[in-house]
Amino acid sequence: MPGVIMDNATVGRLGHAPDTQTPSNGDNLRNGSLHINGAAKGDKDHDPDKESYTGKPKIDGHRALPELPHITQGFFPFSTLVNRYVQQCWNELSDLITELAAIQVSPHSSMPLLPANGKSPGNQSPENVQKKLRILDFAHAKRAEFIKLLVLSQWSRRAHDVSKLIDLQNFIRSRHQAFVDALQRVGEMKRDLVQAQVANPDLQTALEILSKGRLESLADLGYKSSKLLTARGALKRLHRINRIISARLALHDSIPHPFRTYRVHDGRVTFVVRGEFELDLSVGAESELSQFFFVDIRFLYSPSSNIPNGRMSNEIDAKINDKLRDSGLTGCFNFLHGLVLTNKIHILFKQAIELAKGLWSETLRVELLHRTLVIQYWALKPGPKSWVEIGVKSGNGDADSQGVGVPCLGLRWMRDGQEVDSRDIEFDPEDLSMECLLRSVIALHISYLLSSAYGILSEYSLFSTGTLSSQAILNVTEPGECQLSVQLTGSRHLRVSIEPMSGAVTLSATPGLSERSESDASLDRSTIDDLVARVSRLRCIAAIEELESNVRILGFETVSPKGLRNEIRTVFPANVLRFSLFWHPSWERNWVVAATSSITGDNWWVVQLRRSSEVATDFSVSDTSVPLCSGHSMSDTFLATSHQTRSSSFPDLGYCLSGMVAIYANVSYLSDLQSVEFHPPLCALKVESDLQIPDIFIRYQVSKLPRALQLVLPAGLKRKNLLKDTVRLAFHGIDRHKNSAIFVAYGNLVGPWTDLCTLVSKSDSSLVFKRGGSGFALRLLAPAGRPVIVQLFKSLQTLECTLSILDFLRQRRLTPQSLSLTHIAFAYGPRRDLSAIIGIGLSEVPSSAELDPVRILARTDPLLFLTLGIRFKHPNPHRRVQGSLAAILNHASNEAGLDFVTEILSFTLPLMRALEQITSNASRQESFRLQVIVRNACTFLLHYTYQGFRFQLTTSQHSGQLTWVLRELSSPGAGPGHDQLKARLRGTLYHSNGNGWKGLGNGVVADVEGVSNVIWALDGCFTGAQHNTWLPRETKSDQDYSTQPVPEKQSQTGAPSQAAMANDTTITANFVNDKSLQRNPVASNAADVITID
């Protein structure tokens, strides 16, 4: 019944009272009465809630008609319809706006010309026109719908009358249906009465039978009642039947191949078809043309049941006899064979249904198509499906069937959507078990997956080389016993199995992995690739976790790859599944090592994040813009894997990781320099499995070094090639006190050198010489990751300089005492009782930015400079000229240098000893009487402060020999004792001669040995001066100095006493500049050193 839209005034009313204002009241008045829905107008007792009413007699004698049932089903308020339409309009408008927003409108390519009316046509692109059409269509459609609402609104105002019409129509239909039902019942009654009819009785035949006892009209068949059989007669007849059957089967009947197994007994023949049935047949006549008759059948498979008595047994009996009559034994076999095959399929179908409703619920899907049973297993597993089909297989040409051309039950296995051979499936046609069949199929499927995964894993180097082991345990009948054991690391193993019912892969690690690795086990796909991928991921996770836990013990810090993940992935191969970054406090900040793991192998990588000058100071700061400079694989294993039996394997690993960073940084630096030959190249740099850090072999040739790395020597020091050109740089661990990497450079000297090892102090660890050989070793320190190549070249050139100085000293017959890269100590003097130390200094090492290989190759000026110095320990008398000698060593002139310094040491030794003895005091309370001012190594000023006399002692050429010349520079003014001192000087020195010296009238000239006698004679002239001697005006404010009396045993020639030699004084050194050196141009340019005693 269609629904009616009612406005709020009429919804839900069951009946209506008479409305006198209704226009139809007067129109519907007939025969003096008015009826609305079966109620008479003016009836005061009408109950609107009653659906029907039995009429009562009225005053006029008429009965009131019963009230019609009021229909309210399907009525709903008009407001609900309006709300639905409005809501639908709003939703469609929102969808239209979204759709129009997705349409891209192309901009105006050019401004079009305005039409004659001056109005712009707007954007007339196809997209914009399409938008406008969509809006217009939407508006027209909604307008039409709301017009319909308007019509319904107007019509609903008259819904009261329509409701009455509906009630009337419902009444007419119900009466019509009652009429149809009455006709139907009458027809059925007429049909049923036919069976109740009884034929008229045959009274004549009845009277004849009752009177005569027989009916003459019936024919006599001549049957005689048979005699009762005795046991012997029955046995005789059975034997006869047996002979008839045997003769017939042997001579006449064509026996099908499956019926070749039979036995004749008890008057019947029993045909045995293995795995199917036993059939008993017998004959009804001796003729060979008579048919066999069915006696009994027994099924030979389980589960099976006998054919129940009744209709089914009768139908089978009749069907078999018909087949025997029409087709003989062959037709009978074909019928029974097909029946058995169908029965077996139905038995397996019922078992499959029971499994699908039991433990295998939601994992099996069973479908029977004619005589083909389809069982899909692992139904919830995504990807290609797997199922087994059991059906009747034609035996034509099949040698494995029970007979030529005999159908049999066949299996068709679809594994992951592809048909595979089903011969290995365990299926017993005599003992039907769907569960055993499924277990065999699933076991074969699981064995295939695990064996395929095992084959793929065995091809990887980790398993093919025996580093890790794997084992597959397979079973063709029991899927729960199939598993794959994989060794993840030395201490962790993984067992892979597949749940038989659902096909879900189960991964069980021993010991268990962390939670982040267990999330990978949520995948339910068990294809071979996914299975291998999951095993690979777990192996990599286990390897990285085990490595992290052990490496942290060694003091390494894990670096978060949060800001580097995208860039660092480009450094590693695509097959890397897991990696972890480590850093050690003894390394440079821009170097880390990365442990990468994949199913093909594990690797250690050295990664340089960025150049040293650009590295942040803290890894904790997340910098997502850190650029990677380089990365290099240093090993093909995690190194410690092959040393699991050693307890010290991981400490060795810590040593190896630091060595990897240190060696790679230096090889990378050499590779960038390009001008230095080295081995191994950067691409071949590897760490062996025995944790041996490779050494770097460097060809050392100063001439081929970049100009910036060639050491600049002083002009007086000649460069010599004293080292062989092959140097081996080796890593020797970490210095824990200095937190730096230790490098040792091994090399060999050119030519024989003796006693070098005795010259090097045992406390000096920077340089070692091989005893009895030409080998040497240099020790270098630097943080791991900072190259030591510049330091190495600087040390090698310094060593050559040191050996050159040592060779020169030995040529001058000086005795070397000690040797290092910073100094050479040697003994000199007639008795080798004096020692000097030649210091070897280098310029400050430039910053790391200046040492960048790119900048070094671009520079044309040198960065490294060597300076020499000389120092003397107390009481060496040459300490007065120490500064001057150092200036001569580093002078730019080729005439200066070590050769000149050794000559000066020999030439000035008597003078220096005399001055040292004179200026030495017995006690520190004794005042100075002589001031010695050193202008340079060959010019001295002698100042007697008490008397005010100044003398200059210089070198000069005299008679072709180098001599000393003493001259008086100035004299004090007239004062007490001045004339006596003048006279004493003239008498003692100027006009006198002595051992090795001669007076010149206004001075003294002396040879190398005689200058000491001159100094002693000069000092003797002033020894007797008194404390109240006249002092120069400029010295009045100075401290009083008491003179030391000359010992009585001191001779005029200058032989000092032991007491005088034992005196000690305080020396004050002042450095001034003076260019008055008269020895030669070289000496005149040296810096003057003034020593005041």
From Swiss-Prot:
The keyword Nucleus applies. Residues 1-61, 1035-1060 are annotated as: Disordered. Its main location: nucleus. It comes from the Eukaryota. Residues 19-31, 1040-1056 have a biased composition (Polar residues). The keyword Transcription regulation applies. Keywords: Activator, Nucleus, Transcription, Transcription regulation. InterPro entries: Med14_N, Mediator_Med14. Component of the Mediator complex, a coactivator involved in the regulated transcription of nearly all RNA polymerase II-dependent genes. Mediator functions as a bridge to convey information from gene-specific regulatory proteins to the basal RNA polymerase II transcription machinery. Mediator is recruited to promoters by direct interactions with regulatory proteins and serves as a scaffold for the assembly of a functional preinitiation complex with RNA polymerase II and the general transcription factors. This is Mediator of RNA polymerase II transcription subunit 14. The gene is rgr1.
